[in-house]
Amino acid sequence: MTTTETSLSADTKNGIDFKIADLSLADFGRKELRIAEHEMPGLMSLRREYAEVQPLKGARISGSLHMTVQTAVLIETLTALGAEVRWASCNIFSTQDHAAAAVVVGPHGTPEEPKGVPVFAWKGESLEEYWWCAEQMLTWPDSDKPANMILDDGGDATMLVLRGMQYEKAGVVPPAEEDDSAEWKVFLGLLRSRFETDKGKWTKIAESVKGVTEETTTGVLRLYQFAEAGDLAFPAINVNDSVTKSKFDNKYGTRHSLIDGINRGTDALIGGKKVLICGYGDVGKGCAEAMKGQGARVSVTEIDPINALQAMMEGFDVVTVEDAIGDADIVVTSTGNKDIIMLEHIKAMKDHSILGNIGHFDNEIDMAGLERSGATRTNIKPQVDLWTFGDTGRSIIVLSEGRLLNLGNATGHPSFVMSNSFANQTIAQIELWTKNDEYDNEVYRLPKHLDEKVARIHVEALGGRLTKLTKDQAEYLGVDVEGPYKPDHYRY
């Protein structure tokens, strides 16, 4: 699809509005979804536990999260627990079109008569299309019944509502600056266009929303920034820092999907190659471990001496980008920060070396600088480009245009690890929806006993057998026999 923001319109069938690539892919998507359900014991356990209670009845959840097969299982878990849902992807390349089709058609519908959930997502959206989809996800058919919950990944949905409300109260949407990113210009353009037609839209939504649950590190950072500025208009649960999310999805999911993305994108042998991983947080740890497991010679960049020391204890060299970029065969950014690999670094890379990002946003690699550099871009296949510099003749392989390569070049994290993350998301939605009066407009984390609940489900699914504390042992440790077993400050 190459239409512009102004020419897009939703499709409607059987009372469901949606915009996806191909509704006929639903059968394929449903088959993969059924397989994923067997690999997602956390979500299936929550369906069994809460199906009769319907704890999310009355919730109108606007979800912005990668529209994958695994997310399809999450969406249908939310609806099984009573929620109404509208969905968009949080990345222009991450949608799996057959998964989107399966969700729209639903388990009991057909492409001719869909009975599922409105989805606005397809693989390969433009920036204008992406933000149009985000607005559709937040715009419910009955304006008197707007979204009352947000499920977010990266914070774009939350930002759209909160910035929209902020600008409505100010009476003006600020103009874009010349050096603003292309995406920010599109974002402001959308808000400006909507301000002209509906000056109170975002304020109305913000006042209706009872809470947001946030999936990832960068989105959590945005939440804390909104809270510190006094601009957070509803409670938020930081799902990312649940142990069963950050220590599993971020590390073990990345360990699986990074290799998958590089293999599908390039078919390059990793063993023996020099690899530079920028950032050694939970995601960076998964990246480094994955590359080491393939036989690569791995170096790491870090700003934090504690993380740097951890890397060295694992046998990784800690270097600067400037020191290592010229020798690296593969470079992966995983910092959650901006301006990590700049144009001068890219120009210093070896001929036909591989450059990719696995942080949530596309600002870790200076793609704008690369586009302005005069380098020639040759598309090899979807989300794989060869950039050639005329002055040196050297070429660099860039994956997914600097966006998430594990979702752009592959299919993201495997179902089992996402079952941990999405079980946390579901529990967090239930928590905010059913106990809303217990939360202020601040950022919270799920209590430890719920973290342990998610872990226990998955230990049992893998055939593990947990040791049971005696009453005397529990008293000795100062904990309950049934947990929680660790204080909040325990780092795992």
UniProtKB/Swiss-Prot annotation:
Its cofactor is NAD(+). The keyword Disulfide bond does not apply. It catalyses: S-adenosyl-L-homocysteine + H2O = L-homocysteine + adenosine. It comes from the Bacteria. It is found in: Cytoplasm. GO terms for biological process: L-homocysteine biosynthetic process; one-carbon metabolic process; S-adenosylmethionine cycle. Binds 1 NAD(+) per subunit. GO terms for molecular function: adenosylhomocysteinase activity. May play a key role in the regulation of the intracellular concentration of adenosylhomocysteine. PANTHER family: ADENOSYLHOMOCYSTEINASE (PTHR23420:SF0). This is Adenosylhomocysteinase.
